[in-house]
A protein has these predicted regions:
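N-terminal Sec/ER secretory leader and immediately downstream segment
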Residues: 30-156
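Helix-centric, low-specificity signal for extended rod-like, repetitive segments
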Residues: 1-2, 77
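Bacterial N-terminal signal peptides that target proteins for export
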Residues: 2-16
Length: 284
């Protein structure tokens, strides 16, 4: 009978470990009536986060240690991401005026609140179709994002502002309570923190690259448009006059649709000769 009871108890704990929160509540060596000590404002405070310590009544199990590691790494990663995001945002705020000048989307918007397409340019590319075919070009252009309507001009903040909040403090039942548990917590919270900081840097770098690509790609479209190497989007306008019902009234109601998206002009006979500092090909 004792063996059956012991077997059932172990099975319950094993199943509960599939859910991290359930495991810590069901299989903890102590009751979850503790007070959280510390906060998540910096790495040192994170490392020393714990519940008010009580004497350990039994040796910590491997499953409990693994659960503690998982929570420490998860909380550490979220806290590190939020901390690094705040640092990045402080730098962005100090340089806001310069960024407003560099990434001024108002200068490249099209009529009718249309955002230009994003183009990318490649130079001197080689493409090997097969062992007997090699394709060479001096320059290549590609539309990677098409024109579309917006209600407000894009801003650099839409791309690179880091909006990551600090995680909530975990319940005391999920925190280390003994010296042995605090050693585990400190080690894996530090690993999680470092991962979170690296993740924040990676996210920012990716977003900055996307901002630069989109802005330069829209500016490239405007230059090629002047040369006749790409077409404008065609916007059809329908005047609806006065519309509405007993609850809403719309005066001079208009409906706009993009009926033709920009296309690259592959006929060089339609390119225009213009004076430009850009080295893109023009018709002579």
């Amino acid at each position: 009978m004792k063996r059956i009871t012991s077997y059932r108890k172990n099975a319950i704990c094993l199943l509960a470990s599939l859910s991290l929160g359930s495991f810590l509540v069901a299989c903890s060596t102590t009751q979850p009536n503790y007070q959280t000590v510390g906060n998540l404002n910096n790495l040192n405070q994170l490392q020393n986060l714990h519940a008010k310590a009580t004497p350990s009544k039994k040796q910590m199990t491997g499953l409990h240690a693994q659960a503690l590691q998982d929570i420490a790494m998860s909380i550490g990663a979220q806290a590190g991401l939020a901390w690094r995001s705040e640092q990045i945002n402080q730098v962005l705020s100090k340089n806001a005026s310069n960024l407003d000048r560099i990434f001024n989307f108002n200068l490249i918007l099209l009529d009718h609140n249309v955002v230009p397409p994003v183009l990318v340019q490649g130079n001197s590319s080689l493409n090997l179709a097969d062992a007997q075919t090699l394709r060479i070009d001096d320059r290549a252009y590609q539309i990677i994002s098409q024109a579309h309507f917006i209600t407000a001009p894009p801003q650099w903040r839409n791309y690179i502002w880091m909006d990551y909040q600090h995680p909530e403090l975990p319940l005391p039942a999920f925190l280390p309570k003994t010296a042995e548990e605090r050693i585990i917590w400190k080690k894996y919270a530090t690993i999680g923190w470092q991962d979170g900081v690296q993740q924040a840097d990676a996210i920012f770098n990716d977003n900055l690259a996307r901002l630069t690509r989109d802005y330069n790609g829209m500016a490239l479209y405007r230059r090629l448009l002047l040369k006749g190497m790409v077409s404008k989007p065609f916007v059809a306008q329908t005047d609806l006059g006065i519309t509405g019902n007993n609850s809403a009234l719309h005066i001079n109601d208009q409906l706009l649709r993009i009926t033709s998206l920009p296309k690259l002009q592959i006929n060089p006979g339609r390119w225009k000769s213009i004076v430009t500092h850009d080295s893109a090909p023009t018709k002579e």
